[in-house]
Amino acid sequence: MLRMPFYALCSRFLTWSGLLLLVASLATGVSGCNNSDDENTQPVPTVRLETNATLGAHLVDQQGNSIYYFARDLAGTNTCTGGCASVWPIFYEPNLVLGEGLKAEDFATITTTNGKPQTTYKGWPMYYYAPVDAAGQNVREKAGDALGENVGGVWYVMKPDYNVLVARATVLHKTTNQITSKVFLIDSQGRTLYTFDRDRTNPTTLPSNCTGNCVATWPVYLEPGRVLTSNLRSSDFGVIIRTDGLNGATRQQTTYKGMPLYYYSPDGAQRNKVEGDGIGNIWSVATP
């Protein structure tokens, strides 16, 4: 019988061992690649931005369903109850995963009057739209639709970059003491905007009748951009140049339909404060 030399056996053993090690190494590498892919898989956003040809970028859920705000919810609580709640179901997401352009600190959770949790965005409760169909049933609109926009003049898609919005609230007129429900302009933080009747009735060589001590009580408003709810027209907004800036410099002030816009200092720069309507019977909330 032919015998193989010892050194040849060792050589062959080492060769097969090397091959086995190579195969094991490749298998480990492939397995490692698969694990890496799994680890790098990003979760699908549960709230993201979607761009509409007419409305621009607005908030939608994971399936692309539009999300709305209610102009009556200025105080940050859900005021859509009864039959309203059937048409405008609440949006609630306990495990928020946000798409690009959205910030976690802008979202929170509230509890409605019937004990249900609801997600809010920048202080506004979030809703879907479910109009009544031909069979008399409330059916949520399809993904990609935004048919709830401007319904009743108080429902609008949620956007991350509104500069001027509309709110609806009961307002006390400080001269007549009458309380009425009004739709009025607010800034991106929910602060009320006002107009000065004398800017309309008393022509002046200055762009505004409110100067000196007046402007300390009624600070000027300047919008940083022109993203508006759809019931407002960009062409209705403009800018005037004032000469009472810091150290005598000029500064700008936003106008709406030719009327300069102001804040009211006693509102404390707070959301849902409307203390200036009817002051002196010459100041009013800015209405669309």
Task: Go through the PLM ranges and name each one.
Residues 48-66, 111-125, 134, 164-192, ...:
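Short, low-complexity cationic-aromatic patches
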Residues 77-109, 150-159, 207-240, 280-286:
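A low-complexity, Ser/Thr/Gly/Pro-enriched, surface-exposed linker/loop concept
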Residues 1-13:
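N-terminal secretory signal peptides that target proteins for export/translocation
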Residues 10-23:
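Sec-dependent N-terminal signal peptides
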Residues 37-41, 46-120:
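Ordered, small/hydrophobic-rich secondary-structure cores
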Residues 72-76, 96, 131-136, 197-202, ...:
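Acidic glycine-/aspartate-rich tracts in secreted/extracellular proteins
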Residues 2, 22-50:
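Bacterial Sec-dependent N-terminal signal peptides
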Residues 76, 109, 113-166, 260, ...:
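Hydrophobic, ordered structural segments
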